[in-house]
Amino acid sequence: RITIDELRITINEQRSKMNVPVMSDLAARGEMPEVLFWVGCAGSFDQRAQKVTGAFVQILNHCKVSFAVLGTEEGCTGDPARRAGNEFLFQMLAANNIATLNGYGIRNIVTTCPHCFNTLKNEYPELGGNYEVMHHSQFIQQLIAEGKLSMQGGGTFKGKRITYHDSCYLGRANGVYEAPRAVLEILDAELVEMKRCKSKGLCCGAGGAQMFKEAEAGEKEVNIERTEEALETKPDIIAAACPFCNTMMTDGVKHAEKEDSVKVYDIAELIVQGNALLEHE
């Protein structure tokens, strides 16, 4: 069993290896980053999601984006608390984060978690936290449009069948459907849509704080249903843009005993593994 302090030490060591600036250090030098990378609880503490964090940091560094993280000053956005009905805890967490962000004068935020994205963008303003918030799919799309990121010949995934799962908090809650698909286009892969996609997409089963509780009794768990829809497209890869969706779809693939033939990746991982970062070295 590992303590929170030990986990934070490990995370600090990983951050140093990845060349991740910390906001407090920049502020001490009177510097302001172009954007604050909000890592989120999953991206900080979940081993699978940490790989997504690392991939996105690689993209930011490769594209020479001026960014920073809050490090140990970053707290949970409070999304799970509010979804579970604990409004007091949500407002307490939000107030602490807003005080930190406003104290640094932060205006631009990017995050790899749609839950953090939705909360920071749509729920913090009523509490005094007004920021320009982007999901990493939007940010990567912007880097591609600016010519800072490209992939000649499609890279590693050229010709592979990829199906993309729409996160509820990115898609239906915020209308972000095209950005992740535009990012996938530079892979020159075959993008195959599920029968329920975009505004009609099916939840992975982790939304509304369901990630942190046991499923109610029923005929089938939601993530199994959703994964079956994904597998119907006969994909080589299931692409996700949310740490919760990534976990649920991965579990669904394991349930179907397809983990050897079907992989679940975040879009940032696909960009890195597709060798997009080598084109500008």
Predicted regions and their residues:
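Iron-sulfur cluster-binding electron-transfer modules in prokaryotic oxidoreductases
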Residues: R1-E281
